[in-house]
Structure formats: structure tokens, C-alpha cells
Design a protein with these regions (language model features):
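Conserved NTPase motor "head" modules and their coupling/switch loops across ABC/AAA+ ATPases, GTPases
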Residues: 101-229
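Short C-terminal domain-edge/linker segments immediately following a structured domain
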Residues: 57-59, 78-80, 88, 184-189, ...
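Short, exposed "boundary/linker" segments that immediately precede the start
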Residues: 1-6
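Long, charged N-terminal accessory/stalk domains
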Residues: 55-56, 62-111, 115
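Nucleotide-state sensing region of NTPase/ATPase domains
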Residues: 7, 11-63, 69-79, 136-141, ...
Length: 229
């Protein structure tokens, strides 16, 4: 057993974290074992840099949603519960959509899932929108500094549907969802656009532009963690 000790400053005190090698459940704070990842929320806030950060820009919407959710979960302890609840409902709804193909009588039960999905979804949309706005404000200044003022970065939230329209669009898409056997609208299909000098660099940016933009995003996330925790 190899044990390493690291002291992390928090809002409450200087907590002692133990990381144990080769142990699936090898994290403890002040001697108390951490059994769920969510227990670390609000205790230790980390922004990790890696070569894979470039994927935030160049890969698909799923990568960018993971970035948003990862950062929001650090800043908002309730968000992880809302996100887990929403994802559970989407999975259950998709299963029900498939079951409706063989048993059309189950269609009436979709209303219950839709109501819960809209409730969770509106909260997620609102928090993602606010986070992207904050991120954009910080990233613009940081990016100008990184590029010597040559490039102007803009980050725009691209929700699958607005919070105000979610309930109506989910209802209007029901027949389509039944045919496709999946849920076609909601935060699980969100994205955000990254522009440099007005050009969408997700599709048309050079690797250098994408790398610098990804760095700006991560540095901005650090600033948000510092100011909001």
C-alpha cells in the first residue's frame, strides 16, 4: 500500500486528503473515507490540464457538454443531482419509447416522464446558459492576452431548446420520438459554439487556434472556480 498525503485549502479549513494507490475507494478527507465522488464537491476544486483538452473544441457536442457539466458540478453541488436525475429520466423515457412500439397502450405513461424531464431540464438549461455567459466574459480577455490581441474569442451557448419552449417542443416531437425510439430534444443534445474572429473554429479552425481556444476555456474555468467557490 502506497499512501500520499496532499493538503488542499478549502473554504472551511486546510483538509488533508489521502490518495491510496491501487485502491478503487482510496480517498479520505481528514481520516473520513469518501465513498461517492459527489462528496468531494465543494471540498476540493480542481481544473485539470491534459493534451486531450483539444478535444473540447474539435470533437463533437458530447465532449463540450462533458466540459460544461464537469465544471458546473464543481461550482454547484445541486447541479450534479439535477443532471443525474435528468439523465435517468432520459434513459427511462428512451426505454419506454421502445416498449411503446410493441405495446402502444404505454404511450399515456409518457406524460409523467415528460413532466419530470422538463422540470429537471429547465434547471440545467438555465445553469448552463449562465455559466457560458460568465465563461465567455472571462475567456475573451484571456484569449486576447494569449494571442497578443490578434484574435477575439466568443463562446455561445447552443441549447437544443430554450427553457421556455422545452415543454411545448417535447410534446410536438412525441410522434417523431416514438418513430425514432429516442428522445430528440433536451439538454442532452446541447452544444456551445467557439468562434475566433467570427469564424466557427469547431469546423474551420486550425489546430493551433483550437489549442489556444481550449487553453483559454480551461484558464477561464480556473478563474470561475476561484471567484465562485
Amino acid at each position: 500500500l502506497h499512501r500520499r498525503r496532499h493538503s488542499f485549502p478549502t473554504r472551511r479549513s486546510s483538509d488533508l486528503m489521502h490518495l491510496r494507490k491501487n485502491k478503487a475507494k482510496g480517498v479520505a478527507i481528514n481520516g473520513l473515507p469518501i465513498r461517492k465522488a459527489r462528496e468531494l464537491l465543494g471540498v476540493v476544486n480542481l481544473v485539470f490540464f491534459s493534451p486531450e483538452d483539444l478535444n473540447i473544441i474539435k470533437n463533437g457536442p458530447g465532449e463540450r457538454r462533458r466540459f460544461l457539466d464537469s465544471e458546473l458540478c464543481q461550482l454547484d453541488g445541486v447541479y450534479i443531482t439535477e443532471l443525474a436525475g435528468y439523465n435517468h429520466i432520459v434513459n427511462q423515457r428512451n426505454r419506454l419509447l421502445k416498449d411503446c412500439y410493441m405495446n402502444p397502450g404505454l404511450k399515456s405513461t409518457l406524460d409523467v416522464w415528460d413532466m419530470q424531464m422538463v422540470d429537471y431540464g429547465k434547471k440545467i438549461i438555465g445553469k448552463r446558459e449562465a455559466f457560458v455567459e460568465e465563461l465567455n466574459e472571462i475567456a475573451r480577455g484571456l484569449h486576447k492576452g494569449l494571442t497578443g490581441g490578434i484574435e477575439e474569442l466568443e463562446i455561445l451557448y447552443e441549447p437544443s431548446v430554450t427553457a421556455a419552449e422545452f415543454e411545448d417542443k417535447l410534446s410536438r416531437n412525441r410522434e417523431r420520438d416514438l418513430r425514432m425510439k429516442l428522445t430528440s430534444v433536451g439538454p442532452h443534445r446541447d452544444d456551445f459554439c467557439v468562434k475566433v474572429n467570427g469564424i466557427d473554429i469547431r469546423r474551420y479552425g486550425s489546430q493551433g487556434q483550437q489549442r489556444t481556444a481550449a487553453l483559454s476555456l480551461k484558464l477561464s474555468a480556473i478563474e470561475l472556480v476561484k471567484t465562485m467557490t
